[in-house]
From Swiss-Prot:
Homohexamer. Disulfide bonds: none annotated. Keywords: RNA-binding, Stress response. The keyword RNA-binding applies. This is RNA-binding protein Hfq. One of its GO terms (cellular component) is cytosol. It comes from Yersinia pestis (strain Pestoides F). Gene3D superfamilies: 2.30.30.100.
Length: 101
């Protein structure tokens, strides 16, 4: 169980600490937006004009805007972004998910 939380907790904690605006996509396709106010093993408290308790089992994707680094340097000395990809790799254009309907 602790292994599964080792990526989730630092990521959500960075979003909370830095008050990063996020979009949370639910498994039913609904998009929620706000800031992570708090979280635990089962829920995320998302704050916008109101606070919403969102159960993690209903979440498909959490998308920060802008991207957030949630960990320090890797053993090789480079810093990975939140996707864990190579920051020196050529960047591919990304399609906006709102246009893909």
């Amino acid at each position: 169980m602790a292994k599964g939380q080792s990526l989730q907790d630092p990521f959500l904690n960075a979003l909370r600490r830095e008050r990063v605006p996020v979009s949370i996509y639910l498994v039913n396709g609904i998009k929620l937006q706000g800031q992570v106010e708090s979280f635990d093993q089962f829920v995320i408290l998302l704050k916008n004009t109101v606070s919403q308790m969102v159960y993690k089992h209903a979440i498909s994707t959490v998308v920060p805007s802008p991207p957030v680094s949630h960990h320090s340097n890797t053993p090789s000395g480079s810093t990975n972004n939140y996707h864990g990809s190579n920051p020196s790799a050529p960047q591919q254009p990304q399609q906006d998910s709102d246009d893909a309907e």
